[in-house]
Amino acid sequence: MAAKVRSVYEIFTIKSNDGARTIDLRGGIVSFSYFENVFSPMITAQVLITSTGNVITDEDGDLVSIYNGLPLRGGEKVSIKIPSNSENNVDLEFTEEKGNEFYVASITNVLIEAEKEIFTLNLVSREAITNETSRVGKKFPSSEPISDSVKEIIEKYLLSQKNVDVDETQNPY
């Protein structure tokens, strides 16, 4: 069931890769979509941003666009906090303080003109990046239940700080 009241973005910021700049994106959000699936190992989101351009001061003191001013290239941290807007919804909070912020996986649909810019940020959880950059170089014992191997991979290789609930299995490999 859809909410009857619009969402309010308490926090929607992006931090440059060098950590020097943080930009509040709340005024430029056209749409925000959040995806969570029991069959997916990660949380993803998409946000469509529009800006009138020239909102960041660069090193020379000139005003430049968000895309060129941060610059947006991927890997930037995005913090989001959206309180629930109905009794059926839950708060969404992905912030550095909680250690579960999103990361920019890619920037698509980029349109930059003289006085405006539009782009889509494709966001992923930290586990998505770790999943792509980590290797498990171990053979797991065939005598142990699969659930034990899953727990070990998540905790020791993916280094997830999240509370992971793995159903116990009886079957070994």
Description of each model-found segment:
Residues 1-135:
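Assembly/oligomerization scaffold segments
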Residues 113-173:
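Charged- and aromatic-enriched interaction segments used to assemble
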